Amino acid sequence: MQRLQICVYIYLFVLIVAGPVDLSENSEQKENVEKEGLCNACMWRQNTKSSRIEAIKIQILSKLRLETAPNISRDAVRQLLPRAPPLRELIDQYDVQRDDSSDGSLEDDDYHATTETVIAMPAETDLLMQVEGKPKCCFFKFSSKIQYNKVVKAQLWIYLRPVKTPTTVFVQILRLIKPMKDGTRYTGIRSLKLDMNPGTGIWQSIDVKTVLQNWLKQPESNLGIEIKALDENGHDLAVTFPGPGEDGLNPFLEVKVTDTPKRSRRDFGLDCDEHSTESRCCRYPLTVDFEAFGWDWIIAPKRYKANYCSGECEFVFLQKYPHTHLVHQANPRGSAGPCCTPTKMSPINMLYFNGKEQIIYGKIPAMVVDRCGCS
């Protein structure tokens, strides 16, 4: 009996010394720890997102081989942007990005952008010859994107002013050459006859692929072209030097070059949203807004979904390189842990002005994070 009393006294003494146990306080502490962990995760993701946006700006300039962003204002874009069918079609039916989960990442050219279409505007140059005392339109400069790729199509687009009565228009495209002994200064490229009805003006395209290929082989022969579009009364309807109200009606070249993307294998990863509590490596949504940067030189897309990777990479979750796990087990202090990085990326299509005020349409590789993993 005495032994039982002694045990009871000891138990009461322990309760008095330890004090009352507040279960609600422990619960609050646990909740605070969890909230603090979530806040830290949110801050980490926000920092990762900001770093990703800055990296994207640097990558775009680098992949387009631009030292700085072209200094083109919105007003200049409106003036320079042709109001022509091929360009309107690109903008209206613009495919911002391809996100086909059944395909692997595109790895064409590994780094630099691959051009599909180039819109070349007339350039100002001293090389343009004077014919009959007047400068003749037009002279075109060609970037390396055209020079070092196979040209599959080249169309010269010209705008014909509207007519008041039905008429037949005779269109002539002449290539300027060095003066011959007989005084000849040009040679014919293409001629055609059009019937025009009263109303609005029209855009007309002319195949100049052969001429362009010759210019690329012999750049010194590129002295420019002359455009004529005479109606039955001898009036020239071709817009070569746009006047008031004719912004965007300049002649231009639409050049298409080859593009042969390669395919690679696919892998898998986690997808999360900004409210996710997932701690593991995961892909999060991120929209890049070019207008917010003041990058008016990018015609389309004005924004795109880039996404980013964030999260922990414990060795038990290692997805891509199992040998790293073995290295860590053999030397846990001497091996760096895996990082949450993109394991699959895809390109975006972009329509933009380069530094020479040429409009270029092409792919920029590895700009969209499709999947994330630990490596």
From Swiss-Prot:
One Pfam family here: TGF_beta
Signal peptide positions on this chain: 1-18
Pro-sequence residue ranges: 19-266
Record keywords: Cleavage on pair of basic residues, Cytokine, Disulfide bond, Glycoprotein, Growth factor, Heparin-binding, Secreted, Signal
Subcellular location: Secreted
Chain ranges passing through the membrane: none
CDD domains found in the cross-reference section: TGF_beta_GDF8 (cd19388)
GO molecular function: cytokine activity; growth factor activity; heparin binding; identical protein binding; protein homodimerization activity; protein serine/threonine kinase activator activity
Glycan-carrying positions: 71
S-S bridge residues: 272-282, 281-340, 309-372, 313-374
PTM: Synthesized as large precursor molecule that undergoes proteolytic cleavage to generate an N-terminal propeptide and a disulfide linked C-terminal dimer, which is the biologically active molecule. The circulating form consists of a latent complex of the C-terminal dimer and other proteins, including its propeptide, which maintain the C-terminal dimer in a latent, inactive state. Ligand activation requires additional cleavage of the prodomain by a tolloid-like metalloproteinase.
Gene3D superfamilies, A to Z: 2.60.120.970, Cystine-knot cytokines (2.10.90.10)
PROSITE patterns (alphabetical): TGF_BETA_1 (PS00250), TGF_BETA_2 (PS51362)
Quaternary structure and interacting proteins, as annotated: Homodimer; disulfide-linked. Interacts with WFIKKN2, leading to inhibit its activity. Interacts with FSTL3.
Family from the record: Belongs to the TGF-beta family.
Protein name: Growth/differentiation factor 8
Organism (species): Canis lupus familiaris (Dog)
Gene: MSTN
